[in-house]
Amino acid sequence: MTSEDEREPIFERIRGHEARDVIDERQKFRWRHTTLLNDFHDLQDIHELDTPHATERTQQLETQGYVFEVERRLHHYLSGLYTLLQQQRTLQNGVGQSFGEDLQEVKNEYMRKESSRAVLGLRHYAQHENVLPLQARTSKLERSKSLVVMVDDLHREDDDRDFEQHFGHITKPYFDPSEWVIDNWPDVEQFFEDTIEVMEQQAEEEIDELAQLSEEVDELYEQLAEDYRELQEE
């Protein structure tokens, strides 16, 4: 029969094991990514709606609430992306300093992308101004619609450096923010996967050790069940 003295040390080791924090934070990061993925699909769905060109298209779009709904979904996505980036920063500082440098490089790699700079610039603007200055743009030639922002409209007072950093590489006077989000999504996915990979590689020994301890606990529970059956039979 398994004694309590034999069981207690392994339970204590599991409760205080350093890999538990890594696994918990990794799971939170996965949940945040899943939520962002859902926000991305919501934005992608409305962006791909077949809304044909029509007379007075701007007025028709506004009447249908299309502009408002795109703005709402954009704002939701941009907020979620910022939260994902902030959560990765927490992983750098809160799970183990050994992660800090490598996770920062993962973030830096994402931030170097032109589409990342533009998308995060939109988030920065929306954070301060609440609403993106979307305008309906139609093309009679292509018989299509899109919602765009004029680059100059994103220029906030006293933010010349931030404006150049986020939008200085855009050559046209306007752009479709939803298209930039969609183009940027593969880089978001890479950022997420690289973050997970860094955590798993650097904490591999600790995670494996915790998994081994968990297996030993399962075996103990099986032994306890067997001990209980023996007692019932006496």
List each language-model region with its residue ranges.
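Acidic, Ser/Thr/Gly/Pro-rich intrinsically disordered interaction regions
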Residues: 1-71, 100-234
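Short, hydrophobic, well-ordered secondary-structure elements
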Residues: 69-92, 120, 124-127
